[in-house]
């Protein structure tokens, strides 16, 4: 039992603690400002058994003429009332659950207002609706049911679960148990999909995400993803993309010419050198003096551009038999190498991983073949007395930038030629060197570079993650690439970090010889980008090594 006494209440309060309008009270009540009209006060006894709260200016009760107590009587005067009640009053509990929370306080636990602003909650809902409206079109639920009933079954793939599929959950992923050979089941499902839904959807066979174990038939467990064609297939090349590609190509031509000019810097006429180095020189030199200088720089520019175009030609020649569409190349200019290569996108979905490997390797192999030819011919001409007038002077430190190319140059040119401050070489050596370095950078196994695509196709997406992290670490520590590691790493992070999208059949592995080709290519990439350390350079005589 408990006893609570209230003194000089502004309104009579019954055991249910209803609040009453002030017009029913004979005592004089001072009119409160608007900001105080909904101010609530509460007081609690030391026993903490009961709480009384009184709210002034309750709008919901403003039209009430009287207040009804527990016994049904009307109270119109201020009284002092003592209420004695049981701690566990069943009647009070029932009345608390049925009366309005705005004017009754018959429960020990008063409902707390939500801490979330209604405006923010409404904004969240509107944002989700906007994302759904502007996002890619999702698969029709009616089509999902139809495809599930018509395509899948006991003899192909028994569906046990469905999940969202795609970057924004715009597709459906069917999980279950495979009931046949992967390739045969997938081919059968693709034929049925065309019969049921025509060309409306694309079906992907991928490895089951978060699989708890391998498939009983061998290999990874598979699942099938369904996406609308307009969502899963890349869009056509737009006009502004052609404009950007043209601008980048012109800039790449300029950077290649600049590389050729830099290689011929020792051949500048004395008048031109004096004009640019003497602050007192006023009269500019005759521009005709630069014509022979520019003509001598163009062969190197032609060589660099030829390697780039041959690289892209390899991609396109490999894509045509596979009926894969490629975008126009977006060449990336660079003043050190002439170019960082080009960004070439797939404009159609790849059918399988073997196709991804073939197209990805075709470009680097074509570019590397032409680069090796130029490099070899250039080294041979560098030793011929008849080509002495065509040779250019380069710092011997250049040959320390690549372990593989430095050792080949050392074996061809000899100790005396490389163990000096400068080395006389043919411009084709520089063109081949730049082409091989650019090809090696593009074959790094990261993102959607040629090397990343090849590794993803040959060894799977999990292997690409491991290779990619290792590549980023080695670039960050400048283990690979030397002074070009930082700009190349930034370029990859900005433009090429995202892995390629899965193929239609992203489960069937490639053959052993394709894996071997990718492995050999990666070894050559490391040897090309690995600099010659000082101890080895001093021992074999590549450049002049200064030790302290």
From Swiss-Prot:
Induction comment from the UniProt entry of this chain: By ethylene. Down-regulated by dark.
Disulfide bonds: none
Keyword Hydrolase in record: yes
Superkingdom of origin: Eukaryota
One of the record's GO molecular function terms: metalloendopeptidase activity
Compositionally biased region (Basic and acidic residues): 61-76
Membrane topology: Multi-pass membrane protein
InterPro entries noted in UniProt: EGY1-like (IPR044838), Peptidase_M50 (IPR008915)
EC annotation from Swiss-Prot or TrEMBL: 3.4.24.-
GO biological process assignments: chloroplast organization; gravitropism; negative gravitropism; photosystem I assembly; photosystem II assembly; proteolysis; response to ammonium ion; response to cation stress
One GO cellular component term noted in the UniProt record for this chain: chloroplast
PROSITE patterns documented for this protein: ZINC_PROTEASE (PS00142)
Family: Belongs to the peptidase M50B family.
Protein name per its UniProtKB record: Probable zinc metalloprotease EGY1, chloroplastic
Name of the encoding gene: EGY1
């Amino acid at each position: 039992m408990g006893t609570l006494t209230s003194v000089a209440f502004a309104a009579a309060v019954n055991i249910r603690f209803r609040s009453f309008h002030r017009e029913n009270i004979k005592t004089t009540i001072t009119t409160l400002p608007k900001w105080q009209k909904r101010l609530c006060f509460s007081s609690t006894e030391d026993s903490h058994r009961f709480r009384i709260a009184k709210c002034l200016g309750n709008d919901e009760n403003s039209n009430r003429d009287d207040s009804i107590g527990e016994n049904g009587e009307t109270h119109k005067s201020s009284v002092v009332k003592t209420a004695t009640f049981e701690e566990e009053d069943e009647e009070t509990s029932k009345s608390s659950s049925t009366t309005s929370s705005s004017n009754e306080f018959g429960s020990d636990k008063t409902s707390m207002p939500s801490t979330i602003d209604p405006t923010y909650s409404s904004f969240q809902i509107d944002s989700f609706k906007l994302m759904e409206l502007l996002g890619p079109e999702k698969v029709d639920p009616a089509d999902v049911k139809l495809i599930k009933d018509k395509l899948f079954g006991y003899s192909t793939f028994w569906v046990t679960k469905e999940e969202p599929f795609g970057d924004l959950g715009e597709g459906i992923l069917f999980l279950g148990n495979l009931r046949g050979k992967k390739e045969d089941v997938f081919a059968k499902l693709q034929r049925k999909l065309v019969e049921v839904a025509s060309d409306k959807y694309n079906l992907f066979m991928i490895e089951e995400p978060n699989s708890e174990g391998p498939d009983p038939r061998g290999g990874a467990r598979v699942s099938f993803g369904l996406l609308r064609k307009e969502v899963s297939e890349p869009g056509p090349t737009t006009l502004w993309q052609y404009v950007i590609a043209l601008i980048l190509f012109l800039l790449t031509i300029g950077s290649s010419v600049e590389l050729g000019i830099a290689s011929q810097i020792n051949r500048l006429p004395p008048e031109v050198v004096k004009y640019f180095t003497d602050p007192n020189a006023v009269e500019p030199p005759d521009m005709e003096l630069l014509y022979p200088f520019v003509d001598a720089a163009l062969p190197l520019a032609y060589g660099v551009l030829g390697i780039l175009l041959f690289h892209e030609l390899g991609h396109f020649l490999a894509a045509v038999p596979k009926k894969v569409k490629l975008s126009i190349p977006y060449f990336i200019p660079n003043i050190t190498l002439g170019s960082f290569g080009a960004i070439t996108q797939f404009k159609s979905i790849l059918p399988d991983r073997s196709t991804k490997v073939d197209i990805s390797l075709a470009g680097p192999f074509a570019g590397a073949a032409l680069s090796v030819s130029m490099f070899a011919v250039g080294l041979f001409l560098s030793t011929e007395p008849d080509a002495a007038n065509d040779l250019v002077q380069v710092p011997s430190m250049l040959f320390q930038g690549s372990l593989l190319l430095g050792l080949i140059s050392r074996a061809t040119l000899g100790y005396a030629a490389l163990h000096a401050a400068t080395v006389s070489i043919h411009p084709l050596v520089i063109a081949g060197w730049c082409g091989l370095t650019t090809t090696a950078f593009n074959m790094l196994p990261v993102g959607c570079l040629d090397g990343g695509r090849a590794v993803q196709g040959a060894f799977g997406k999990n292997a690409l993650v491991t290779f990619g992290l290792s590549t980023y670490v080695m670039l960050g520590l400048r283990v690979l690439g030397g002074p070009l590691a930082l700009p190349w790493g930034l370029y990859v992070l900005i433009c090429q970090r995202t892995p390629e999208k899965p193929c239609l059949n992203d489960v069937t592995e490639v053959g052993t010889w394709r894996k071997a080709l990718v492995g050999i290519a990666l070894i050559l990439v490391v040897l090309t980008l690995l600099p010659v350390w000082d101890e080895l350079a001093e021992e074999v005589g590549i450049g002049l090594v200064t030790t302290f």
